[in-house]
Amino acid sequence: MATQISKKRKFVADGVFYAELNEVLTRELAEDGYSGVEVRVTPMRTEIIIRATRTQNVLGEKGRRIRELTSLVQKRFKFPVDSVELYAEKVNNRGLCAIAQAESLRYKLLGGLAVRRACYGVLRFVMESGAKGCEVIVSGKLRAARAKSMKFKDGYMVSSGQPTKEYIDAAVRHVLLRQGVLGIKVKIMLDWDPTGKSGPKTPLPDVVIIHAPKDDVVYSAPAQAAAPVTLVQEAPLTTVDYPEMIPPVA
């Protein structure tokens, strides 16, 4: 028998479940280009779609790894048997995914690449992928003993209002180096896409679209109208005109 739960508790429970699931998958699939998760609840089962840049590594050999993740999620969150399914979806354009770029920058720094070179490489790749703007912030003990932050920007970036929720994709990651922990923040501003595939459908509120003027339409002269026909009303017949119409006197 299903237990009754208030709407407020339901929203909180769903948020906690999503946050914990996202944390587990972030730690487990960090090296496989994990870029987010989507949860779809149907009457029959719960579908969990994992977005990653390397889906083959997420699936594993003959689907072994995805089955292990399914068993882990099922036991951790107490799902009934065969009521949860995990799927792997490939990210179409990883240059427009902030999570994928933050993970890429993280592994570049772990590999010993200089901070400036790594950040400029990420900026260039994001802008070549069709983004409208990009911002990368790296903070921590970069060179000297004193911590500082370095900001790298390119293109156009909005920072307030409703467009930040629709156009900005942001991600934060941390990397542990020999000198300490560095913080990485990547913000990508997507471009407007009427189809909704590579960007939001709604245009920016300050965008003005000037339509091209229409061509002047040349109207031809109307055809010559025929002369109007005048109707002449005849006078009524009288006995003066026709005497035979006079009735005989009895």
Curated annotation (Swiss-Prot):
Organism lineage: Eukaryota, Viridiplantae, Streptophyta, Embryophyta, Tracheophyta
PANTHER family reported in the protein's UniProt record: 30S/40S RIBOSOMAL PROTEIN S3, SMALL RIBOSOMAL SUBUNIT PROTEIN US3X-RELATED
NCBIfam families noted in UniProt: PRK04191.1, uS3_euk_arch
PROSITE patterns, per the entry: KH_TYPE_2 (PS50823)
Domain spans labelled KH type-2: 21-92
UniProt source species: Arabidopsis thaliana
Name of the protein in question: Small ribosomal subunit protein uS3z
Quaternary structure annotation from Swiss-Prot or TrEMBL: Interacts with SNRNP35.
GO molecular function, one term: mRNA binding
InterPro entries referenced in this protein's UniProt entry, alphabetically: KH_dom-like_a/b, KH_dom_type_2, KH_sf_prok-type, Ribosomal_S3_C_sf, Ribosomal_uS3_C, Ribosomal_uS3_euk/arc
Highest taxon in the source lineage: Eukaryota
Family according to the record: Belongs to the universal ribosomal protein uS3 family.
Keyword Ribonucleoprotein: yes
Record's keyword annotation contains Ribonucleoprotein: yes
One of the record's GO cellular component terms: plasmodesma
